[in-house]
């Protein structure tokens, strides 16, 4: 089971970040529109979840299911267990989830540009009606801070909590229905 350690960097200049990553020698991954549906039991209580389950579809027809454990906040980053695997037929899995008593409670769409550099993964995410942000995944909080300095982002605002809280608390938008 993999652990992710990540932080979100807010208030970024998207073109400047892309340029800096390419100058460092980062590998750019093709851009995608992601469509994400979240599932849980009907009696879920927001903020009390012990795990999260989603089906994510990429614009290139790749689909995956992800189970995530509740995150631990590590200063400016967060850590959580995560299991991902590819699925060929997301509609059938969605039907299966509903048959075993789960319900779809949220839907998002976002555009993503990703890069890989050494041991880091970078995702520039753009949701509708809000500024883009950069998510950095690394081996530790210090590892993430190291690359923030390389990118000259160490003075930017960071966010360690989940995207739902970011979207609802900072941008006052409905995370449950983020559609283009």
Model-based region annotation:
Residues 145-156:
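Long, well-ordered alpha-helical scaffolding segments within enzyme catalytic domains
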Residues 125-129:
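A contiguous pocket-lining binding segment that forms or flanks enzyme active sites
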């Amino acid at each position: 089971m993999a652990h992710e350690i990540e932080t979100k960097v807010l208030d970024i200049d998207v073109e400047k970040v892309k340029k800096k990553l390419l100058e460092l020698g980062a590998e750019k991954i093709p851009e995608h529109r992601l469509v994400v549906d979240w599932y849980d039991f009907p009696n879920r209580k927001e903020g009390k979840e012990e795990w999260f389950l989603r089906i994510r579809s990429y614009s290139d027809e790749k689909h995956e299911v992800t189970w995530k454990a509740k995150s631990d906040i590590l200063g400016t980053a967060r850590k959580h267990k995560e299991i991902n695997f590819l699925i060929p037929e997301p509609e059938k899995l969605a039907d299966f989830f509903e048959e075993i008593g789960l319900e779809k409670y949220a839907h998002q769409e976002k555009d993503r540009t990703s890069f890989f550099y050494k041991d880091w993964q970078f995702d520039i995410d753009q949701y509708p009606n809000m500024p883009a942000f950069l998510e950095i995944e690394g081996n530790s909080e210090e590892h993430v801070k190291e690359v923030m300095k390389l990118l000259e982002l160490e003075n930017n605002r960071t966010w360690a909590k989940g995207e739902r809280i970011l979207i609802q608390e900072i941008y006052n938008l409905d995370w449950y229905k983020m559609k283009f």
